UniProtKB/Swiss-Prot annotation:
Any one of the GO CC terms: cytoplasm
PANTHER family documented for this protein: IMIDAZOLE GLYCEROL PHOSPHATE SYNTHASE HISHF, IMIDAZOLE GLYCEROL PHOSPHATE SYNTHASE SUBUNIT HISF/H IGP SYNTHASE SUBUNIT HISF/H
Keyword tags: Amino-acid biosynthesis, Cytoplasm, Histidine biosynthesis, Lyase
Keyword Cytoplasm set for record: yes
Protein name: Imidazole glycerol phosphate synthase subunit HisF
Gene name of the record: hisF
Matching InterPro entries: Aldolase_TIM, His_biosynth, HisF, IGPS_HisA/HisF, RibuloseP-bd_barrel
Length: 257
């Protein structure tokens, strides 16, 4: 059995790591490189960096901190934020990123997924999906430009349809960001993740809702995800990554210690 992965997420805005609640009211939590180094030392399997305002404001991730992170850590990391062209993706990979994640640009130009996959191979192409449960219609819908509350907009896509579409176009991995759960630390959305797992043939990363070690165990056991992403519980020291991995191992979850 492949080991499950623990993935700290670092949302970046104006060169600092920030964290919000339900994608709003972001506050600064630290500097990029020291936090990345800390998580690598603590035993993270991988890191994800989102430049949360890049797509909404027509910008691209700042390559300077990408190279600094690559110099400081020896675990894989993925970067996202405003990547719309092969040249932009190539630059981030050249500066040391192991994977490229695209979210809003793929919704604007779905064929971008295929072009990236053809050029770099699907193993390094991650699709981020910002999924919102709409109670009025009792459905999961995909949102775009979520890094800026004023720019956030609805799309034509239901989550399950977009999950199937991005796989057809060649993505190698999916991160499902459950917007309703984000930052509230009430647990992952097992129901939605299980639904996506049933139609997802590529690695699936759960994002949004981690508050306790048991939440990680539950999402691995019940939703069968390949990795669990979290931010605030790590940033605020609520959960230590090493202790989390020992807990998961003790509960018979395959994990790298």
């Amino acid at each position: 059995m492949l080991a499950k992965r623990i993935v700290p997420c670092l949302d970046v805005k104006d060169g600092k790591v920030v964290k919000g609640v339900q994608f709003r009211n972001h506050a600064i939590v630290g500097d990029i490189v020291p936090l990345a180094a800390r998580y690598a030392i603590e035993g993270a399997d991988e890191l994800v960096f989102y430049d949360i305002s890049a797509s909404a404001h027509g910008k691209v991730i700042d390559k300077s901190w990408v190279s600094r992170v690559a110099e400081q850590i020896d675990i894989p990391f993925c970067v996202a934020g405003g990547i719309k062209t092969l040249a932009q993706a190539r630059e981030k990979l050249a500066f040391g990123a192991d994977k490229i994640s695209i979210n809003s640009p793929a919704l604007t130009d779905p064929d971008l997924i295929s072009r990236l996959q053809d050029e770099f191979g699907r193993q390094c192409i991650v699709i981020g999906i910002d999924s919102f449960f709409d109670a009025a219609s009792n459905s999961y819908k995909v949102k775009q430009f979520t890094g800026d509350e004023a720019a956030t907009k609805d799309t034509q896509w239901y989550t399950q349809d977009w999950v199937e579409e991005v796989q057809k176009r060649g993505c190698g991995e999916i991160v499902l960001n459950v917007m309703n759960q984000d930052g509230v630390r009430g647990g992952y959305d097992i129901k939605q993740l299980s639904m996506v797992r049933s139609i997802c043939d590529v690695p699936l990363i759960a994002s949004g809702g981690a508050g306790t070690m048991a939440h990680f165990k539950d999402v691995f056991e019940q939703a069968k995800v390949d990795a669990a992403l979290a931010a605030s519980v790590f940033h605020k020291g609520i959960i230590d990554i090493g202790e989390l991995k020992q807990y998961l191992h003790a509960n018979n979850i395959a994990i790298r210690l």
